[in-house]
Amino acid sequence: MKSSWVKRAALCLSAAALAASALAACGGSSDESGPPELTFFVAIQPGGTIEEVSKRCSEESNGKYTITPEFLPTDASQQREQLVRRLGAEDSSIDIVGMDVIWTGEFANAGWVEEWSGADKKAVTENVFPNVIETASYEDKLYAAPFNTNTQLLWYRKDLVKQPPKTWDEMIEQAEGLKEAGTIQVQASRYEGYMVFVNALIESAGTEILSGPEEVDLEQDPTEQALQVIGKLANGGAAPPSLSTSDEDSARLAFEAGESAFMTNYTFAYASAQAEAPEIGKQMGFARFPRVDASKPSKPPLGGFNLAVSSYSKNKDVAFEAATCLANKDSQKTAVELDGLPPSRSDLYTDKTVTEAYPGFAQLVKESIEESGPRPTTPAYQDVSLAVQRALHPPDKIDSSDTESIYDELKSKVEDAVKREGLL
């Protein structure tokens, strides 16, 4: 069965090079002589989570289906582009889609993924964080099974910092007092990670970029307060020289090299430091993502990916069943164990698998997810994200003492973005 699928995949790849419309002709992930072979398009995880859960669910189906992962490019933009082209061509060779949390509005609005309902919906939303369910929903309908989620913590050097700061202003002040050892690592290159950073600051300040798929919010005073944080960091002594080109990995590497006292980053940073820089790792403290306004709780970033059933699958019924298995409690525990991916189910945060992966901070991760600020759900998300990046990058263009003009530019660009529903 596997060899026949490989032949079909090769034919599809050749057809893709000729024309996007030919992709649909390559559909058909079933072998008439056996159970449906479900193709699972998803980003690879280095620890092997996808292969392991696909194998287990296939075995547990008792011959009802087999799941074959088809790995997307490592770059998130290229992942989306490939899926947009295939789904836009009504490619029936895709059965299950691993969707970044920010794609839900776009894919659902385009009619590319199926709505979840009934027993399937109940099974995949049981004990799942409401904020995570929100990332899998569009216009009050569920379009994906929540699988893994993620959030950022404040990581700091316990040998340099006696008490972790509660606000960005406090952290910048502490960092500047530490001189060269006190830089702050964030994600501020011109890419989606910068949108994550900006959105978390705006949400933490008490407003949001969008209040609905096409409704711009961006209340002026709190938005300017968030922009002041970026400008103050970027133009002060706490900024590393590489701030405007920093991403999750470069931030991690700089922290592990002992170049910074503070870092906001995802949970993978802890395990990486323990393995790659144990002397730094043993001094690694953790705290909640800092506040923008001292009087308001922070709203940490929220990431992750969810599992959708393609509207063009020829095996939708079993695809829903398979996706339910891929997203179940056992699968989420596997994702924690093999790749350190936080589960979307709140009831797993006292499970030994999770507490061992996040020693001492499992409940902080849970709290951060519960009180996170998701990015907007809108069909025009890509345009909105690009608008934010264009308005606010490089970060040192923001004058913290005069943010009105940059606020006007940001709001204008976002308003233009929501008028379109660009797919590429």
Placement of each model-derived feature along the sequence:
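Short helix-initiation/N-cap motifs at beta->coil->alpha
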Residues: 71-83, 102, 169-170, 242-256
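Conserved C-terminal helix/tail region of periplasmic/extracytoplasmic solute-binding proteins
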Residues: 367-424
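Extracytoplasmic/periplasmic substrate-recognition and gating elements
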Residues: 232-238, 275-339
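Hinge/lid segment of periplasmic solute-binding proteins
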Residues: 101-151, 163, 170-172, 182, ...
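Conserved N-terminal structural module of periplasmic/extracytoplasmic solute-binding proteins
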Residues: 2-15, 19-105, 278, 293, ...
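Paired acidic/hydrophobic, glycine-rich loop segments that form the ligand-binding mouth/hinge
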Residues: 95-98, 261-266
